[in-house]
């Protein structure tokens, strides 16, 4: 038996409510800026404009596509968000290659919104735990002596920042960044940087005095992680990492509840 296409003549005569509903709804028309964006994107992907090459001026694009300046500017802004062009003041747009950072940054708005949903932070914390668990296992098996030396240096900066919360947070992020760099995968780095940015931005504001004990606990847990990596023991490194991140999550949840009660 042939499958009926929703847009053929038989489907149009169908008495179903779905068919009637479809006939009453006109297809949405694309904005001029979207049409310009799509055409320019195809031209870039066909290499009609090479990487580093400048696109025609706004005036030339207006004439070529027979559209106004706002449509051209909206199209170029959309291409910039996709990482396909760079736009500097006073210069024509220049073709660029999307990076891992560009890809992840496209998700930033949605991720930050998701973090405000019930359970959103817990879901992202679980994602971070799964992700960094793989990173430390890889580090224990594959990290070079030079990479372990970088972890050791990050630990030293950690220890020097214990009494300054702002500095400690930066040194904490740097420690985990060094871990994320070990596989040499730029996508891992982009994901890791974004994850930490999103989670840190979602943390509650708490007095500095509340964080001093937490800083010292985190530092001691970092030491255990690095020791396990030095010993080339992926299971031990994984357990140490999970202990650390579960401790961090529990601390911030407790601080968040305490902060809410004080309001």
From Swiss-Prot:
Record organism: Salmonella typhimurium (strain LT2 / SGSC1412 / ATCC 700720)
GO molecular function per UniProt: DNA binding; DNA-binding transcription factor activity
Name listed for the protein in its UniProt record: HTH-type transcriptional repressor NanR
Domain annotation HTH gntR-type: ranges: 30-98
This protein's record includes keyword Transcription regulation: yes
Keywords: DNA-binding, Repressor, Transcription, Transcription regulation
InterPro entries: GntR_C (IPR011711), TF_FadR/GntR_C (IPR008920), Tscrpt_reg_HTH_GntR (IPR000524), Tscrpt_reg_NanR (IPR023730), WH-like_DNA-bd_sf (IPR036388), WH_DNA-bd_sf (IPR036390)
Alphabetical list of CDD domains matching this protein: WHTH_GntR
Gene Ontology BP terms: negative regulation of DNA-templated transcription
Cysteines engaged in disulfide bonds, as pairs: none
Family classification: Belongs to the NanR family.
Function in brief: Transcriptional repressor that controls expression of the genes required for the catabolism of sialic acids.
Residue spans binding DNA: 58-77
Region (Disordered): 1-25
Domain of life of the native organism: Bacteria
């Amino acid at each position: 038996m042939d499958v009926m296409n929703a847009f053929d003549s038989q489907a149009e005569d169908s008495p179903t409510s779905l068919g009637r509903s479809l006939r009453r709804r006109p297809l949405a028309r694309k904005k001029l800026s979207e049409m310009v964006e799509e055409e320019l994107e195809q031209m870039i992907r066909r290499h009609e404009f090479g990487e580093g090459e400048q696109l025609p001026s706004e005036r030339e694009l207006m004439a070529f596509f027979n559209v106004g300046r706002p449509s051209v500017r909206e199209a170029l802004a959309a291409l910039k968000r996709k990482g396909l062009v760079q736009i500097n003041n006073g210069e024509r747009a220049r073709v660029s290659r999307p990076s891992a950072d560009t890809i992840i940054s496209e998700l930033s708005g949605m991720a930050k919104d998701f973090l405000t949903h019930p359970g959103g932070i817990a879901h992202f914390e679980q994602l971070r735990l799964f992700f960094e668990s793989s990173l430390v296992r890889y580090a224990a098996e594959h990290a070079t002596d030079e990479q372990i030396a970088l972890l050791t240096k990050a630990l030293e900066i950690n220890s020097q920042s214990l009494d300054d919360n702002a500095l400690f947070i930066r040194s904490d992020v740097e420690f985990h960044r060094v871990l994320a760099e070990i596989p040499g995968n730029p996508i891992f780095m982009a994901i890791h940087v974004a994850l930490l940015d999103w989670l840190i931005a979602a943390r509650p504001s708490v007095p500095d005095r509340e964080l001093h004990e937490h800083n010292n606990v985190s530092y001691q847990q970092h030491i255990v992680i690095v020791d396990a990596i030095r010993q080339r023991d992926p299971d031990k490194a994984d357990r140490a990492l999970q202990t650390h991140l579960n401790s961090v999550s529990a601390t911030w949840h407790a601080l968040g509840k305490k902060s809410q009660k004080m309001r």
